[in-house]
Amino acid sequence: VNNETVATLDLSSETAWQYVGGDHVYDEPGDGRKARFRFDEVHTLLGRQVEKDDHIQIVKVGDDQNAYGIDFIELEQAAPAIERPEGAVSVADYQGAKPDDGVDDSDALIWAMNQAAAPSKTVYIPAGTWEFGRKIGLDHSGLTIQGAGMWHTNVRFTSDQAGGGGFVFNRGVGGVTMTD
């Protein structure tokens, strides 16, 4: 912004092409599969307000040979991070779990959901990127899973196995709220 570096974005073409055959989506081309292009969406906080007439420039700083096409950028004012609600159980309370470390936080989330099942019913996922390497079963009705806000908490499922990530509502579970 105005010739000052305010953020760095990591872009990847890893999921740029998918191949559809019947009801299935594949990462590799094959007979009868139709190629489909998708976009890598990334977001970041700039740490400052962008004002009218500011100049925004995106510059490639890596030395790879990849070309990048930027379709568009979208700017919006990000709300401040949401603080931990009173009485909430935080995933960060689990044995030193912390965001942005590349470590699987599945056990921390499962622990927090089990702890919140009776006393508070709220699980808090603080700001940062939290990685989950497997499918997370929701076992308790009435839970609220609360992040620090869409610009602050990132939930990333890292399994490369089909059906290996995401949330699954186990039998009889309902009334779960996931927010921010």
Regions found by a protein language model. Name each.
Residues 1-86:
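Extracytoplasmic
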Residues 30-38, 103, 157-162:
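Extracellular beta-rich ligand/substrate-recognition surface
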Residues 35-39, 108, 173:
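Signature of short aromatic-glycine-proline-rich micro-motifs recurring in repeat-based ectodomains
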Residues 54-56, 88-89, 121-123, 179:
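Hydrophobic beta-strand segments of well-ordered beta-sheets in folded domains
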Residues 74-110:
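Right-handed parallel beta-helix/beta-solenoid
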Residues 106, 110-163:
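N-terminal extracellular ligand-recognition/capping segment immediately after the signal peptide
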Residues 168-180:
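Parallel beta-helix/beta-solenoid
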